[in-house]
Amino acid sequence: MSELLDHRGRPRIAVTGMGIKCPAGTDVESVWSTMRAGQSMAAPIELFDASDLEVRFACETRNFDPVSYFGPKDVRRQDRVTHLGYAAAADAIESAGELGADPEQCAVVAATGVGGLTTLEENCHTFYERGPSRVSPFFVPMMMPNATAGVISMKFGFTGPAFCVSTACAAGTNAIGEGVRLIRDGSAQVVIAGGTEAFTAVTVAAFARK
């Protein structure tokens, strides 16, 4: 049997690059070291004021500066969920090296459980406290679940399929599976696949309910 085929005779799919931004670290090596050490990432919440919450600790992604990936202007036009997802994708693409495929053969499947909740919460607060004229014109493109897939595609010039998978905690794994399908059915030669999420005060409050 050809080394290019699996035991079912299907084309083998290779992972050529990886990127990660998570509580255990902001690169593959540091995350692997943290996991092997069995180190807990739980700590007091610093992303927002959690003093009124019943639960005031969580696992945050720390030591991450989205400006280094977006620049000082563009970073304000993206939700934190996109900051994390795009940065991880950019690192994965860099580690993969030459992609070896035309832009129309490069696809993106970026998963999320919900999407830009930070943007949603902030703009709902603005709407009710300061009026509709103060809502950000970037509100919809910042909070929609497929924002990360769109940003990755546009910034890297990919013109193949680009979409979001939203299946709760299974979303990232489902995205990888969809990437495999795209390659096997000939819809793409390269797929950037993974998941991203960013918790907020409201999500912490919801999960803390008894």
What are the residue ranges of the model-derived segments?
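Acyl-thioester C-C bond-transforming condensing/cleaving domain
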Residues: 2-10, 25-26, 37-45, 94-105, ...
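Short secondary-structure transition/capping motifs
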Residues: 20, 74-85, 137, 141, ...
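ACP-dependent fatty acid/polyketide chain-elongation machinery
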Residues: 1-74
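Generic hydrophobic secondary-structure packing signal
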Residues: 30, 34, 81-88, 171, ...
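A glycine- and small-residue-enriched flexible loop/hinge segment at structural boundaries
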Residues: 47-98, 119, 145-159
